[in-house]
Amino acid sequence: MYKTIIMPVDVFEMELSDKAIRHAEFLAQQDGVIHLLHVLPGSASMSLHRFAADVRRFEEHLQHEAETRLQTMVGHFSIDPSRIKTHVRFGSVRDVVNEMGEELDADVVVIGSRNPSITTHLLGSNASSVVRHATLPVLVVR
């Protein structure tokens, strides 16, 4: 199947990832590696010089919380945990997914999407952005 799978997740909305987990596992059947990726918003500290230290501390707290939740998510998979890598990065989801795809020479992105609404049209805003700007195949799971 696939050797390198990137799975962007929102650790603060884990229910979006439940179905995507099963699809990612299926694609990684033989010996594929799943890279769970949580992307935090880019820093605003450049425009908030007076609060830069507080912003940094808050970002560190968010990063630690995201890493902890990603480790919890690893337990939801049925494949060997050594085949699941976790990553927390800062930036926009679409840019980080593309950057990581190049870094890892990834084969596919598997992303969960919420039910359609008038504001997100057919996909969630992050899933939609990833699909529109992807440089590799994307499987969107509802």
UniProtKB/Swiss-Prot annotation:
InterPro entries: Rossmann-like_a/b/a_fold (IPR014729), Universal_stress_UspA (IPR006015), UspA (IPR006016). Gene3D superfamilies: HUPs. Transmembrane segments: none annotated. It comes from the Bacteria. Coiled coil: none annotated. Belongs to the universal stress protein A family. This is Universal stress protein G.
